[in-house]
């Protein structure tokens, strides 16, 4: 059986030592005092470790069952969902007006990582509802908000997003689902959607589907797509539930992972729906949910890496195999523990340095979202737009790789289902695909985000890194951290310059290097985070604050990242500068 322990100490350190929330003027941050955040994180950690994680393997083994049109989730899910709902965890960072607790998104993200690490499939029921509610909050009418949000905030009603159809995934302009206007102002929605997470279940009274469809006679392609609210049960004027709507689950998808989440084929047969936002502006409204979801999916990559690492570390400490090359370290046993061997340590430090750097990056991104949304900071809004594809793509690619490395620590036992390690790998795999496949994230980064607003957001990022290096210093105790970061940042700038010089005359040159650019950017972001953590821990040690062992460990891990992982930027730059020719040399029929 696997275990999960919420990383509360690390999150507290990031909030208060690194992100310095006490001195952040963003509205709502004044209440984020150490005692308060500690209490929230400790309670959330208990739920994650004691309630959600014990159901993780249950969900994987049992999956969901479709019976007479109703999906039954795995044993224990419904009771756990009630417990999460009753504890107020479903609307931690949503507005009080509709029943939320109005805490910063930063704190909600920290709690979300814990829940996702404990049980990703379970947490998706809540997470998708959060995203759907956010879309209604931004684009809905007052009546729609009053009707749906209180129940969705509490998760008495859950939510979904319906985009994909059998013949169209990334290219939603090929969509065939139709929305025919009705005399009462509603629309009759017809079509089939696939891969719909949490599309049907019995853990909530109602399910509010957000569905993309085309109104007949509208513009061709993506410009003709609109977004609709389609409830499972129609809602009466007094808020009570009426008759069943014309939407049903016809099949549960058989998947590689996240078996505990009901991934459904949804059939719409003249279902009653209501326009959310403007006609033919559906993608604008849906992207409110999609952008939030992409941050959440990046979080999933980190979360699965964390839980896999915890179990791999336990195994490396307990499993006796071979002797240390420098001498026996466990004379009373038949062999030394795995963790004495350099390659196992390299493996574990790859994981540890990624996870802790990624957590800092994710929470910094959440802080930027708070500054943009709560503080109306336009610069922060631009930074979030720039970094969203990096958070989604880099964290899920690397997060998946780390679950594989954790599995590798177990050797053959990692390949056996009994240990539970394969579930982390299987569950992590989908995060590289849904909410925009990572190749698409890379194209978005290079094709749109770099040049957005005249390139001022990427220049702001370069200035941020440069400012940190200048302030921290390139000599003294910080030099071993700032010098590698400075070099990596130059690699990122060189890659950006290559795209500027070659992208217009040869678009394939930019597109062929986009994936490497996303990873190069991700490494620089984590390098910046490790620089900030090194600075914070050096300061804490100098002042005699906190746990000295914790801070020394941070510094050792920072050194590992700077010397062993950050140099990957040079590999990515070399690939980018090789241009399109190596990628495009073969005609399609020669593959």
Curated annotation (Swiss-Prot):
Tree of life domain: Bacteria
Catalyzed chemical reaction(s): 3-(methylsulfanyl)propanoyl-CoA + oxidized [electron-transfer flavoprotein] + H(+) = 3-(methylsulfanyl)acryloyl-CoA + reduced [electron-transfer flavoprotein]
Enzymatic class: oxidoreductase
pH dependence remark: Optimum pH is 9.0.
Induction conditions: Expression is up-regulated in the presence of DMSP.
GO molecular function: flavin adenine dinucleotide binding; oxidoreductase activity, acting on the CH-CH group of donors
Pfam families, sorted: Acyl-CoA_dh_1, Acyl-CoA_dh_C, Acyl-CoA_dh_M, Acyl-CoA_dh_N
Enzyme Commission (EC) number: 1.3.99.41
Consequence of changing residue 281 to A: Retains 54% of wild-type activity
Temperature dependence: Optimum temperature is 40 degrees Celsius.
Stated consequence of mutating residue 170 to A: Retains 8.8% of wild-type activity
Outcome of swapping residue 223 to A: Retains 9.4% of wild-type activity
Signal found in the keyword field: no
Keywords linked to the UniProt accession: FAD, Flavoprotein, Oxidoreductase
Effect of residue 161 to A: Retains 37% of wild-type activity
Cofactor: FAD
Active site: 435
Swiss-Prot/TrEMBL domain comment: Each monomer consists of four domains: an N-terminal alpha-helical domain, a ten-stranded beta sheet domain, a central alpha-helical domain and a C-terminal alpha-helical domain.
Complex and partners: Homodimer.
Described purpose of this protein according to its UniProt entry: Involved in the assimilation of dimethylsulphoniopropionate (DMSP), an important compound in the fixation of carbon in marine phytoplankton, by mediating the conversion of 3-(methylthio)propanoyl-CoA (MMPA-CoA) to 3-(methylthio)acryloyl-CoA (MTA-CoA).
Record-stated family: Belongs to the acyl-CoA dehydrogenase family.
Name of the featured protein: 3-methylmercaptopropionyl-CoA dehydrogenase
Protein's organism: Roseovarius nubinhibens (strain ATCC BAA-591 / DSM 15170 / ISM)
């Amino acid at each position: 059986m696997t275990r999960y322990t919420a990383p509360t100490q690390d999150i507290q350190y990031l909030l208060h030592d690194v992100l310095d929330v006490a001195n952040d003027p963003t509205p709502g941050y004044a209440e984020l005092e150490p005692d308060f955040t500690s209490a929230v994180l400790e309670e959330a950690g208990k739920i994650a470790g004691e309630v959600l994680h014990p159901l993780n393997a249950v969900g994987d083994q049992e999956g969901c069952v479709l019976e007479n049109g109703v999906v039954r989730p795995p044993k224990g899910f419904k009771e756990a969902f009630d417990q999460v709902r009753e504890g107020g965890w479903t609307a931690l960072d949503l507005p009080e007006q509709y029943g939320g607790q109005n805490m910063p998104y930063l704190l909600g993200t920290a709690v979300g990582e814990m829940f996702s690490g404990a049980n990703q499939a379970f947490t998706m029921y809540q997470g998708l509802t959060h995203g759907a509610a956010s879309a209604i909050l931004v684009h809905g009418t007052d009546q729609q908000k009053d009707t749906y949000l209180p129940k969705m905030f509490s998760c008495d009603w859950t939510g979904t997003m319906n985009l994909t159809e059998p013949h169209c995934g990334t290219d939603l302009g090929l969509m065939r689902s139709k929305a025919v206007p009705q005399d009462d102002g509603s629309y009759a929605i017809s079509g089939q959607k696939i891969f719909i997470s949490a599309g049907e279940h019995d853990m909530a009274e109602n399910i509010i589907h957000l569905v993309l469809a085309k109104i007949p006679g509208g513009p061709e392609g993506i410009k003709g797509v609109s977004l609709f609210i389609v409830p499972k049960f129609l809602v009466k004027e007094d808020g009570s539930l009426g008759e069943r709507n014309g939407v049903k689950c016809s099949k549960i998808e058989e998947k590689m992972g996240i078996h505990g989440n009901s991934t459904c084929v949804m059939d719409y047969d003249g279902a009653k729906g209501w326009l959310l936002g403007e006609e033919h502006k559906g993608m604008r409204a849906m992207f409110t949910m999609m952008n939030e979801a992409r941050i959440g999916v990046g979080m999933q990559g980190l979360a699965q890496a964390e839980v896999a690492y915890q179990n791999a570390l336990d195994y490396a400490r307990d499993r006796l195999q071979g002797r240390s090359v420098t001498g026996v370290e466990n004379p009373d046993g038949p062999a030394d523990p795995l963790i004495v061997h350099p390659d196992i340590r390299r493996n574990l430090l790859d994981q540890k340095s990624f996870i802790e750097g990624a957590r800092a990056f994710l929470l910094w991104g959440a802080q930027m979202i708070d500054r943009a949304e709560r503080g109306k900071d336009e610069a922060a809004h631009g930074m979030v737009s720039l970094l969203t594809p990096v958070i989604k793509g880099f964290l899920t690619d690397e997060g998946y790789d780390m679950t594989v490395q954790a599995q590798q620590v177990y050797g053959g036992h990692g390949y056996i289902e009994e240990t539970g390690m394969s579930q982390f790998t299987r569950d992590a795999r989908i995060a590289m695909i849904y909410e925009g496949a990572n190749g698409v994230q890379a194209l978005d980064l290079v094709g749109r985000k770099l040049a957005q607003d005249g390139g001022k957001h990427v220049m702001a990022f370069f200035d941020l890194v440069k400012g940190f290096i200048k302030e921290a210093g390139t000599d003294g105790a910080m030099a071993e951290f700032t010098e590698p970061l400075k070099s990596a940042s130059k690699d990122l700038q060189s890659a950006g310059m290559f795209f500027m010089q070659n992208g217009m005359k040869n678009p394939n040159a930019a597109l062929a290097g986009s994936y490497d650019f996303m990873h190069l950017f991700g490494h620089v972001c984590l390098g910046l985070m490790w620089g900030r953590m090194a600075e914070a821990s050096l300061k804490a040690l100098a002042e005699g604050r906190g746990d000295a062992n914790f801070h020394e460990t941070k510094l050792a891990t920072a050194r590992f990242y700077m010397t062993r992982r950050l140099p990957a930027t040079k590999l990515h730059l070399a690939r980018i500068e090789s241009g399109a020719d190596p990628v495009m040399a073969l005609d399609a029929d020669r593959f």
